[in-house]
């Protein structure tokens, strides 16, 4: 594949890396018995000079949905995971930590940011100790996110995240 430049969400240009896309697709398809080559072939044929990385992700999600069938229902789960990864990326960017996906569920750090941004009332700081807030963070199980299929994650985003 010739060197194709894509536009990242922050406006930077970068060479399209089909191995990086394949790794994302493999992570989304983990645990399912699916041949991911139709999805990878489709996206590699779709990518063109100057395309945005968000458009590439949208194409991956829609193509995974289109691959869903009676014979291959797990593609709806792959589409859901891809949508979830997109949400993680948007969340990381909104929190000014482009590559901090491992910290998205760091509840005390999240609360500090929400207090600093004025989104949450600082009254919580007086009512709960740092240890209690850290304990509350342990109740969140990121692995449960991977259970959502496309319809589930889409509903969650539209209903509860006001997208």
Region locations from a protein language model:
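Extended catalytic cores of very large enzyme megasubunits
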Residues: 1-163
């Amino acid at each position: 594949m010739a060197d194709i430049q894509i536009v990242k969400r922050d406006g930077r240009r970068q060479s399209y890396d089909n191995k990086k896309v394949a790794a994302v697709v493999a992570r989304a398809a983990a645990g399912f018995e699916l041949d991911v080559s139709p999805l990878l072939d489709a996206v590699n044929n779709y990518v063109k000079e100057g395309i945005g990385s968000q458009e590439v992700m949208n194409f991956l999600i829609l193509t995974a949905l289109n691959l869903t069938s009676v014979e291959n229902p797990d593609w709806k789960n792959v589409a859901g995971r891809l949508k979830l990864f997109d949400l993680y990326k948007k969340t990381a960017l909104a929190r000014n930590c482009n590559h901090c996906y491992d910290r998205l569920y760091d509840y005390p750090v999240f609360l500090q940011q929400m207090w600093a941004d004025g989104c949450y009332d600082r009254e919580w700081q007086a009512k709960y100790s740092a240890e209690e807030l850290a304990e509350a963070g342990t109740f969140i199980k990121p692995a449960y996110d991977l259970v959502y299929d496309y319809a589930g994650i889409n509903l969650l985003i539209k209903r509860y995240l006001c997208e």
